[in-house]
Structure formats: C-alpha cells, structure tokens
C-alpha cells in the first residue's frame, strides 16, 4: 500500500501508539482472511496508509508468546523514549484504524480511569486462570471479558501496570 492522499488521520501529539510482534514472517499467526500481511502486519500497513505514526517493537524469539509483550513494553517504557501523556498498544495482526485517534482519547477521557481495555465475548486464556474467570463472571453481567488487543492509558499508569503484570 502507498500512503493515502485522500484519507489521512491526524496523529495526536500526546499519544504514542505501539505494537509488539515477532521479527520476520507472521505466517504462523495470520488467519486466512488476512493472508498477504505475513511480512508487514495489517496494522503497520493501515497506519502507513493513514499517515499515522506507529512504534513497532520486535522480538526474534519463536514461537511467539504474548507474554513477550510485557518485556518489550517494559523495556520501551523504561527507556525514556515515550514522552507522551497517553500510551496505546494495539495487536499487529488483527487491528486497523477506522476513525481518528483523537476520538479514542476523547472516549478514554470520558471515563474516570487510568487505562481502558477492549472487551470481547471470548474466554480464551481464562482456562489457565479458573479463579480469575470465576471472579470475572461474578462481576460481569454482560458476558464481556478483558482483551489486551487494544488498550489506552495514561503513560505513567501503563508503565506501572506492565511492571505489575510481569510479577
């Protein structure tokens, strides 16, 4: 894809957008509907197309495990490179932008929170945490579950959250 000259979103100056992925091909994780994005993820291409900045953190360990994200994000956030008020992390292989990033900041700020996560109906991963699943089901009346494929937060809080998750 080439940069889109007709549709370009404005990247907010106070937002860092990051994705984590493995070095090289993504073919072992691409669903058939997204074939063609094995070398450069659909998110990377989407961001280029819309003229948005994306920090791509890569790791050469295979097979890929999502737990690598914690280490990669911790290293990046501890490096001092991220100087923005807001920090957003997006999955590389199945997330695209369809609206202005400023809208996400507006939605985030409409809640009284330091981080806001996407939710899903999927219970993937909860089989490894039956106590957590029971607790979530006890407070969750809409059948929605936390999904870290898209989240935004105040950078200082996300930094602490990542460190806590690594314990």
Which sequence ranges carry the predicted segments?
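N-terminal anchoring/stem segment of glycosyltransferases
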Residues: 1-86, 110, 156
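Short, flexible, solvent-exposed loop/turn segments with mixed acidic/basic and small polar residues
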Residues: 6-7, 137-142
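Short, surface-exposed beta-edge/turn micro-motifs
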Residues: 14-15, 113-114, 147-148
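Intrinsically disordered, low-complexity regions enriched in proline, serine, glycine
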Residues: 56, 98-99, 161-162
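Short acidic donor-binding/metal-coordinating loop in glycosyltransferase active sites
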Residues: 92
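Conserved donor-nucleotide/metal-binding helix-loop-beta segment in metal-dependent transferases, i.e.
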Residues: 95-139
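Catalytic core and acceptor-binding pocket of nucleotide-sugar-dependent glycosyltransferases
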Residues: 143-167
